[in-house]
A protein has these predicted regions:
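Hydrophobic beta-strand segments of well-ordered beta-sheets in folded domains
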Residues: 15-19, 42-48, 72-82, 107-115
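C-terminal accessory extensions appended to soluble enzyme cores
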Residues: 92-103, 107-269
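Ligand-binding grooves and catalytic loops that recognize ribose/phosphate and carbohydrate rings
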Residues: 54-83, 89-93
Length: 269
């Protein structure tokens, strides 16, 4: 605890970030974050993990943690749904039930619902070259925000980006080994579009550019001026030779940039 508390205290003057804790974190972590928030008046966030139907143990842990927050401290609520895909058709209803219990616990500064709907990228998913998967997380958000509950208008949206929860947990690739294929990604209103590309071989560059052209030809492509991600796809499609065709890290970055840009615009009133 003392090490974490020291790091937090040293960082408070140079960073606007708030420390995050939650009912599943060790007691020492919780205590350090609570003390930091009290002594610096910088606030904190409480992250509640809900990868499925909520349970009484989690609710009890949140209540205990909230009871230890200094009354003068501002707190943010992060309801983290984890992976939201086809096997969770009731994710919005689960969220509402959880929020019914969480929102009255204290006067939260902000409240956000987080989740990720991007599928696990596998050879089987891409065996036909292209896969189109529903944005289950976005569909759940739409259902959630259609509720007439008073607190819904205060909710903010949190997005895992255009990688699966497992992919995020694995971290970035070392660039060594791996399959002979990668993926270009694009986000439409209700779907994720994934297209298989080669990572090696004499035809690699030409094949990648051809796939980039396919994305540009999608009816839902927003145009090269929509953002940096779209501009990269255009430049990739129009280029020549291997330069500018990217690699796994660049494809993921371009995918995340176009996705987050589109999501941010979609959330504007």
């Amino acid at each position: 605890m003392s090490v974490l508390a020291h790091v937090l205290s040293a960082d408070v003057e140079v960073s606007p970030l708030r420390p995050v804790t939650g009912p599943e974190r060790p007691e020492g972590h919780q205590a350090a974050v609570l003390e930091h928030a009290r002594s610096t008046a910088s606030g904190l966030a409480i992250r509640v993990m809900m990868p499925g139907e909520g349970d009484d143990a989690v609710a009890h842990g949140v209540r205990d943690l909230v009871a230890r927050v200094d009354p003068a401290v501002e707190a943010d609520l992060l309801l983290d749904l984890g992976a939201v895909r086809a096997d969770r058709p009731d994710a919005a209803k689960e969220s509402l039930r959880a929020l019914d219990a969480l929102m009255p616990l204290m006067p939260w500064r902000t409240a956000a619902v987080l989740g990720g709907g991007f599928p696990d990228v596998t050879a089987r998913l891409l065996e036909h070259g292209t896969a189109v998967e529903p944005r289950w997380d976005w569909l759940a958000w739409r259902e959630l925000t259609s509720s007439t509950r008073e607190f819904v208008r205060r909710l903010e949206y949190g997005d895992y980006g255009i990688d699966s929860t497992r992919g995020i947990a694995r971290g970035p690739s070392s660039g060594k080994g791996g399959p002979p294929w990668g993926v270009l990604r694009y986000t439409t209103d209700e779907s994720f579009v994934l297209m298989n590309v080669l990572t090696r071989g004499d035809d690699r560059a030409a094949a990648i550019r051809a796939v980039a052209w396919e994305i540009l030809a999608l009816p839902d492509f927003r145009g090269a001026t929509a953002g940096v991600g779209e501009a990269w796809l255009r430049d990739c499609a129009r280029g020549e030779g291997p330069r500018g065709t990217g690699n796994a890290a660049i494809w993921l970055r371009a995918g995340n940039v176009q996705h987050m840009t589109y999501v941010a615009r979609s959330l504007q009133p």
